[in-house]
Design a protein with these regions (language model features):
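Bacterial lipoprotein signal-peptidase II cleavage site
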Residues: 6-7, 21-37
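Flexible loop/hinge segments that line or gate small-molecule binding clefts
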Residues: 119-143
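An alpha-beta-alpha
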Residues: 63, 151-198
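Hydrophobic alpha-helical
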Residues: 108-116, 120
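Extracytoplasmic "Venus flytrap"
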Residues: 32-34, 41-69, 75-88, 107-110, ...
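Periplasmic-binding protein-like
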Residues: 97-107, 127-129
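Sec-dependent bacterial lipoprotein signal peptides
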Residues: 1-22
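Short, well-structured alpha-helical segments in soluble
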Residues: 85-99
Length: 198
């Protein structure tokens, strides 16, 4: 069950990020950007960083795919333990100041920092994964319907269980994971109501 869920989520996230990075590849305005010379694409990872076998790794795979398919120069930066919004703001500012465009924050934890940095760098396009709260012309929200992918994982789990019991581990107690869990449980229930989710 867990492997199918990771493959589904990672595949969807990788494809979505590669397309989003390509779509964000232009600048938010026509003025000023060409004169400073955009370096390419940059992503700032969320907690866990590369090697998390989850959404950060999916983001990295999308970045590498964009680099390979479109020839973009890329940069990626890791989070630090116990970091603050000020640390995130500094990281995003550094990437924008270096000329990376777009700059994508992987995860809703970047929302506060990105809102501030986007205002300081209006000619840089920013993207944020799993957050739709920033209303700025130069910020693209990259929000997924996570409950749809997890529904399919629930279907696969219900079809493959031999014990009529499947498990779900959400990782963190946040609304996004609650939606993921709801989709998973609904997929199990719709496929076989006798299967119990623990």
């Amino acid at each position: 069950m867990r492997r199918i869920s990771r493959i589904t989520v990672a595949g969807a996230a990788t494809a979505s990020l590669a397309l989003a990075l390509a779509a964000c590849g232009g600048t938010s305005t026509d003025s000023g950007s060409e004169s400073k010379g955009d370096k390419g694409l940059a992503i700032a990872y969320d907690v866990g960083g590369k090697g998390d076998q989850s959404f950060n790794d999916a983001a990295y795979a999308g970045l590498e795919q964009a680099k390979k398919e479109f020839g973009y120069e890329t940069a990626d930066v890791e989070p630090t333990d116990g970091e603050t919004d000020a640390d995130k703001e500094q990281r995003l500012s550094s990437l924008a100041k270096q000329g990376y465009n777009p700059v994508v924050g992987i995860g809703y934890a970047y929302a506060s920092a990105m809102k501030n940095v986007a205002a300081k760098y209006p000619d840089t396009t920013f993207g944020i994964v799993d957050d739709a709260t920033i209303e700025a012309k130069n910020v693209a929200d990259l929000v997924f319907n996570e409950q749809e992918a997890s529904y399919l994982a629930g279907v696969a789990a219900a079809k493959s269980t031999k014990t009529n019991t499947v498990g779900f581990v959400g990782g963190v107690d946040v609304p996004l994971i609650h939606k993921f869990q709801a989709g998973y449980e609904q997929g199990v229930k719709d496929t076989d109501p006798k299967v119990k989710v623990v």
